[in-house]
Amino acid sequence: MKIRYAAIFLALPLLCTTAQANSFLHYAGEFNFRTGEKQNNVTIAGLSAIIFDAKKNIFYAINDSRNNNKEGDASLYTLKIQVSSRGIEQVNFLNQRPLLDAKQQPFVTNTVDAEGLALTHNGKSLLWSSELGAPLRLSTLDGVMEKDFTSLFPARFNISSDKESSNGIRSGNAWEGLTVTPDGKSLFIAVESSLKQDGPIASPINSGTARLLQFSIDADGRPSKQLHEYLYITDPVPQVSKFGINDNGVSEVLALNDHQLLVIERSGRNVSAGFNDWDYSVRVYMVDLTAASDIKNIDSLQDWSNKSTLQPVSKKLLIDFADYTSSADCIEGVTFGPLIDGHTSLIFVSDNNFQPHQQTKFYLFIDKENKLKI
């Protein structure tokens, strides 16, 4: 997500979250890179998603550059992360490759803004979401696009919509979260915030809505058809900026199975005049789809006459980063990592937004009771 918003104050019912974070997760610390820092000639910036390939013991990451002079190349990274019960021992970036289109050329400027990343079940390709251009693409492990899946998305998302259109995704609030289920049979992709026809985005006085889509995946790891669509309610903006610029939305999802996911809500607030100096509040929720309504046939939540019959997904607070660190940055990626002494690990990564005052940060949690075991 690029930070370029003005605050919107419209009314939706408040969603009050009273659940406490779970104690079975042990926070094992963070590992940071300064903006501008390089490693093995790799520029470390703009990381918006990360995924672990357990068979190869490597991680893939992606950045959200729009292929412009300021942000550099839209890129795919491979890296090694050494973890132990003591924390993150080392992060080694192995290489950085440009994301290329089907003709093996760099994407045209402002037709790419990669936000989500998932490894196909066969380990041969990568799926990634984008806020610009095609919402979902399949690429080789070297970053060359094999196919885009725009045709799978319903017309209500108005993929090519401009800022003046009255329906569809909002600029900068589009396709943030992406995950493939552990069995490789389906994927989830999440819109960051409310569609234009669904109501207002989150503000300090109202919740927001986000749509979570589920697609089936064929034997080759390619999405084939939409299965379901669910309503996720984001929290109101938790902290208000005196400059009146703030937001809250979904920044990533991670599937535990076909009906339970982790969802990151990332809220930013401006701490000085302008648009480039932000602090963040980040919460992670355990989400269950079991009792949720399927809204794939509802084009507009605002116009739907039977709102009282709609059941959003359930959510329970798992992690509030404010409980563990005073400097949570713009966290946009999460993956399961290597086992640590037989325990599941979670690794989060932040997007420095190519800004000098931010950092690229990796955060490690260890599931001491293996409650998140997949």
Residue ranges of predicted features:
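Bacterial N-terminal signal peptides
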Residues: A7-L15
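Sequence/structural signature of beta-propeller domains
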Residues: A21-I374
